[in-house]
Structures are given as structure tokens and as C-alpha cells.
Amino acid sequence: MAFPKWKIMQLILGLDAFTNAIKNGISGIKFDAELERLKFSCQISGTPEILEELKSNYFSDLELRNFNSTGILYGVIAGLDAWKDAGLPIENNENPDWETGTIFGTGTSGIEKFRESIYKIDAFETRRLGSTAVAQTMNSGISAYLGGKLGLGNQVTTNSSACTTGTESILMGFERIQQGKAKRMLVGSTSDSGPYIWGGFDAMKVCTFKHNEQPEKGSRPMSATASGFVPSSGAGALVLEELESALARGARIYAEILGGNVNSGGQR
């Protein structure tokens, strides 16, 4: 029996630059002075550089007040860029889009905001946490932000399954459409950056420490000389949509999903 055909509209954060880097072997891994200061064994990282000017293209001044969650920052940028690349409008109206939802995953998000909040609470400054502390630190914060910005009225969920989170979100979104419960789904995943996320991995000694002097050579997962992974962060997003719907509105179509499956992953 043939699978129904669904289509994907894809955009990865900085798609043009990312594609150029892959084609030309350009590494985004750099020396991380903060990891050196904190005496990490691995002192290189892949951290997106987001300028304040760029942030203002995706968040209002009010939203950026007391904002301190890189995972949500990366996810919102990737999600909104994917939405626009799919030819979908970003509108401010009172009517939710009941046919569209999001399943956007994260491993850990808002750790810096957690740290900030803990210090304020311990200093008896709970009232200074701000009204967005919860949204920035809850796992489903990224899907809540995207759902709110895009007015999504269908399922708004965050999944979390370590390294398979992004792939799992695609399959979950695909199944939602396949079951006839949604016309389109914004899917993807995001991850915070910083030492409080990466410290545990450094302690496990699974991060490379042999390339601190040559960061661009640190990420080499398929090499016989690989000595561990490089702590990194960022986000990726896709718009999944019914074939008929995508064709009817002349959407840019990148690929087709025929099916998929989720098992127990790498657990022993």
C-alpha cells in the first residue's frame, strides 16, 4: 500500500551561509574564551552569533526585556524563517489558524534564565523575576513562543528525545497531518548554548580536547582521529504540509516524506 504524499518546505538558520560552508568545507567551530576561563577540557564550541539588531527583527522590545534564553532565541528565528520561506504570511489577527500547529523540540532550554532566577530567589528578589520567567524556562517555551507569534490553533507541543529530538518532531508532525488532524505543521528543534549546558558532557570526557589550538579541525565525526564531539547549539525548522494544500498555493517544495518510524534509539 502506497504512503500518502506529504511535502516539506525547509529552512535551516542561515541557509545560504550554511550551504556555502558545507560546499566549501568552512567550519563554524571557534575557540571559546569562556570555556577556557572555566577550565573546561574542551575549549572550542559552535555558538551562533546573534546580533541585537537581528533579534529585533523577530522580537519586540517588550519581549526582549529580561530575555535570557538562547534556545528560544534560536528556535524562534529558525521557525519564523522557515514559515516565511514556505510562503506563509505572519499576520496579527484575532482568529487562530486551526489547521496549523507546531511540534518543536528541545533538549534543554532556558538554563541561563534558570540560573538568573535562582540567584534572584536566593537574594529574596522573587518579585523581580519578571512575567516571562516561566515561558523562558519551561521545556515547551519554544513551541509556546512560536504558537503565539504565528497564531497557531492546532496542536502546540514540545518533544524531547536527546539527539533524535529534531527527527522525532518531523515524524510527529508528519503523523499529525497523515491522520487528518492538521493541514500543516511547523516542526524542528533547538538547543541552548553555554557552559551550564555543556559542563556535564565535558565532565563525561566525551568532548574533544585535542583541537583547542585548531578549532576548525575539532568536528570530525567520521574520522579515525575523532576524539569526541564539539559542544554546539542552534536550531533547525521545517514546514510540513499536505501535498494538495502546498500545490494549491504554489509553495516552494524541497522534499517529500514517505514515512518513518521511532524506536528505542541508542539505549542499551
Question: Which positions does each model-derived feature cover?
Answer:
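Glycine-/small-residue-rich "gating" segment that lines the acyl/pantetheine channel
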Residues: 123-130, 171, 175, 179, ...
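Short glycine-aspartate micro-motif
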Residues: 99-103, 183-187, 254
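Active-site-proximal alpha-helical scaffold in enzymes
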Residues: 75-88, 139-150, 156-190, 229-251
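Low-complexity basic/metal-binding stretches
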Residues: 3-11
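Active-site pocket-shaping loop/turn-to-helix segments
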Residues: 9, 59-80, 129-138, 156-171, ...
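Conserved beta-ketoacyl condensing-enzyme motif
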Residues: 17-19, 23-158, 190-200
